[in-house]
Amino acid sequence: MAFIIRAQNVSFCYSEGESKSPPVLKDINLQFEKGQFIGIIGHNGSGKSTLAKHFNALLLPTKGNVYVKDMDTKDAKHLWDIRQTAGLVFQNPDNQIVAAIVEEDVAFGPENLGIPPEEIRKRVEYALKAVGMWEYKDFPPHMLSGGQKQRVAIAGIIAMKPECIVLDEPTAMLDPIGRREVISTIKKLNKEEGITVILITHFMEEVVDADRVIVMDDGKVVLDGTPKEVFKEVEVLKKIGLDVPQVTELAHQLRKEGIDIPSDILTIEEMVEFICR
């Protein structure tokens, strides 16, 4: 089985020595298969964003190891290969966009890799078409909506030809329309392009279609399974301050009222199918 990322006994503190801070990550053990769509959820301060930054060596474990395609992130000679394998998209697209024109921004990463101009042009066209932004290639980024900017930021990562994209709360600053645009793009890249997607989010509905959902609390993994397996644990999720998808919450309340309804219903379609039986 091909694991694109492995975390072994990973713990992390932001400061050590005399002023050592409490651990933000505590003995994390995870393995991600190539081609999966993985959602990582948790409330603010759970450690999910800190963990995301370990997946492309932006942060290094205080204890334990992270491997990207068997390359140890602590080994400096692998740094560029790791970051080309696992691209990171940040919460605020304005922090990731560096050029005055969309096309130039997407070309920035490949140019830094020393890729020939003709290949860069092909990559830019491919990346912008993949996220549905090719028609905006000549636009200045400040003329775009928040969702469009985030799609350009994702295109900039795609142009590097990563095998995995890690997205750290990419929809947190977007309106509902922008969120739908970005999530639709992410799903398309995973299903049609085979890119491994690791989505960090606090919007439960965004990971309903994931292959796997990981729930974090206080720097630890507390749940790990398919969306159905995770979201049926309504009381566990509520105890750590998380909501569940609205349809799952409805099913949970109906069960409490004595109605025999499956606890793992996630979508409106599943609810309608059950009611119509």
UniProtKB/Swiss-Prot annotation:
Binding positions (ATP): G42, H43, N44, G45, S46, G47, K48, S49
GO molecular function: ATP binding; ATP hydrolysis activity; ATPase-coupled transmembrane transporter activity
Subcellular locations according to the entry: Cell membrane
Documented EC number(s): 7.-.-.-
Organism superkingdom: Bacteria
Bilayer disposition of the protein: Peripheral membrane protein
Alphabetical keyword list: ATP-binding, Cell membrane, Membrane, Nucleotide-binding, Translocase, Transport
Principal location class: membrane
GO cellular component: ATP-binding cassette (ABC) transporter complex
Top-level enzyme category: translocase
Subunit-level organization: Forms a stable energy-coupling factor (ECF) transporter complex composed of 2 membrane-embedded substrate-binding proteins (S component), 2 ATP-binding proteins (A component) and 2 transmembrane proteins (T component).
Family: Belongs to the ABC transporter superfamily. Energy-coupling factor EcfA family.
Role of this protein: ATP-binding (A) component of a common energy-coupling factor (ECF) ABC-transporter complex. Unlike classic ABC transporters this ECF transporter provides the energy necessary to transport a number of different substrates.
Protein name in UniProt: Energy-coupling factor transporter ATP-binding protein EcfA1
Gene this protein is translated from: ecfA1
